[in-house]
Design a protein with these regions (language model features):
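A long amphipathic alpha-helix within ATP-dependent nucleotide-binding catalytic cores
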Residues: 146, 170-221, 225, 229, ...
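Glycine-rich phosphate-binding loop of ATP-grasp-fold ATP-dependent ligases
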Residues: 82-130
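Short catalytic/ligand-binding loop motif for oxyanion handling, primarily in non-cytosolic enzymes
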Residues: 40-42, 64-65, 90-94, 151-154, ...
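Protein kinase-like catalytic core scaffold
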Residues: 82, 141, 168, 220-222
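Conserved N-proximal alpha/beta basic substrate-recognition cap immediately N-terminal to
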Residues: 1-102
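Phosphate-binding site of ATP-dependent enzymes
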Residues: 109-200
Length: 253
């Protein structure tokens, strides 16, 4: 998504430089921390002080154990359904690719992708006692209360995308409790709950996407992403990304 937003900045006359790795960073008025890892490595953190402004400079850990307010332990008294997820963003695929690259003693070549099995779909269990011991014993998994948004029209999921003060918040419908992009339909713009703005402040986000639901009038944040993807540009998305790009202005003051 940021690539599409940056195209608007360039059209406005801003110079945008994309830098890979943690060395040879140019001087800049604003730096955007855009590293697709759940936890930002120390070598990146050390370099941030050289810039006067760092977008997402405080959003250093987006693991489920940091983001979620619905984590469970095996001895909790929760009696409802639960869902098992990876603690790492996107099932830790990027971390596994990085580990492959290091084990091969070379970076991945342009266009080369390490074979990493996609993470299994979130698993829903009727109760805590149905969760296998292997999950509780794993540091890579978390167990959360399963709190879907559901009404007579089916299930819903909401996404709040923001850059500074520019934002859009959309709700999609779906027939399944675990909402997938291919099954999302009937998008509609909805207000951003104040509780979600508080979560953004807690997590230190300036730019990103929050996936959430409203369950029994309660806002439930289940994913926070500082490197969101985007569908192929269309007329409506181009306009939306141009609106998002306006959020840069507050960081240039």
């Amino acid at each position: 998504m940021l690539r599409h937003v940056a195209a608007t900045w360039e059209a406005q006359g801003h110079r945008v430089v994309v830098v890979a790795g943690s060395q040879d960073w140019p001087d800049a008025d604003v730096a955007i921390l855009h590293v697709d890892l759940t936890v930002i490595p120390e070598e990146y953190r050390r370099g941030l002080n050289r810039f006067p402004v760092v977008v997402n400079g405080a959003a250093l850990d987006i693991s489920k154990r940091v983001v979620s307010r619905n984590l469970l332990n095996r001895d909790d008294a929760w009696t409802g359904a639960v869902v098992v997820k990876s603690n790492l963003n996107d099932g830790g695929v990027t971390e596994q690719q990085l580990a492959y690259s290091k084990s091969a003693h070379r970076p991945l070549l342009p266009g080369e992708v390490a074979y990493v099995p996609r993470p299994a779909t979130y698993e829903i269990f009727p109760s805590i006692r149905d969760v296998p011991d292997s999950v509780w014993e794993s540091n890579s998994s978390v167990v959360e209360r399963f709190l879907p948004e559901h009404d007579a029209s089916g299930y819903s999921v909401r996404a709040w995308i923001f850059f500074g003060k520019s934002e859009r918040c959309t709700r999609w419908r779906c027939d399944e409790p675990i909402v997938k992009a291919t099954g999302m339909r009937d998008p509609e713009l909805v207000p951003v709950p104040e509780e979600l703005r508080a979560e953004r402040r807690r997590l230190g986000f300036d730019y990103g996407k929050f996936d959430f639901v409203v369950h029994d009038d309660r806002v439930v944040l289940f994913d926070a992403n500082r490197t969101p993807g985007a569908p192929p540009p269309r007329n409506n998305t181009v306009a939306a990304n141009a609106h998002l790009a306006a959020g840069l202005d507050e960081f240039l003051k």
